């Protein structure tokens, strides 16, 4: 069965909202096991995101702690959204955080990271299809950013759910993931 991204967004938002805190914690532990199978030795700058607790997002802070413990040379950066210009850029982490218009934590805008400096990015998503196309919250920030990013960028999706059938409404602006991890599997697309 084929599905549109809007239909997938609706289904996956409901599934995500139904997750309990303990279910999320268990799946985060399983996601961490999958992340441990990835070779991080060629990553020097990792772009990530701060999880939204009210959206039951995967705990990327847990993943980064593991990665930085084993690979202390990796520097992390996080997005700052410019809602007026419908774009985002990444900045190296700061100890002090600020909330943006969407209630998402962001670093202070001091050390912007050029897109060609980022080796690997953890991409937030609600779900993905069998071709590596992601469905997010529908604002398009990541699609626009990934379109201008380094062509060798390793794009890793992090999902609580297995892939859906192929989305019927992908277009040239949809940048597929390199791979996506779920609690039970790692899917490679490139």
Predicted regions and their residues:
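Conserved phosphate- and dinucleotide-binding cores of soluble alpha/beta proteins
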Residues: 84-190
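N-terminal active-site beta-alpha-beta segment that forms phosphate/nucleotide-binding
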Residues: 2-99, 104-109
């Amino acid at each position: 069965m084929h599905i549109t991204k809007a239909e997938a967004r609706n289904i996956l938002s409901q599934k995500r909202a139904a997750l309990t805190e303990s279910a999320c914690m268990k799946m985060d532990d399983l996601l961490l096991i999958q992340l441990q199978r990835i070779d991080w030795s060629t990553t020097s700058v990792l772009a990530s995101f701060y999880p939204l607790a009210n959206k039951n997002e995967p705990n990327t802070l847990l993943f980064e702690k593991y990665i930085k413990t084993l690979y202390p040379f990796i520097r992390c950066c996080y997005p700052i959204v410019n809602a007026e210009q419908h774009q985002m850029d990444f900045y190296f982490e700061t100890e002090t955080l600020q909330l943006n218009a969407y209630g998402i934590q962001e670093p202070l805008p001091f050390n912007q990271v050029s897109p060609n400096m980022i080796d690997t990015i953890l991409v937030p998503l609600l779900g993905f299809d069998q071709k590596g196309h992601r469905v997010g919250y529908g604002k398009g920030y990541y699609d626009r950013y990934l379109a201008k990013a380094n062509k060798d960028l390793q794009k890793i999706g992090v999902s609580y759910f297995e892939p859906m059938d192929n989305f019927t409404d992908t277009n040239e602006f949809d940048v597929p993931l390199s791979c996506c991890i779920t609690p039970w599997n790692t899917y490679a697309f490139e």
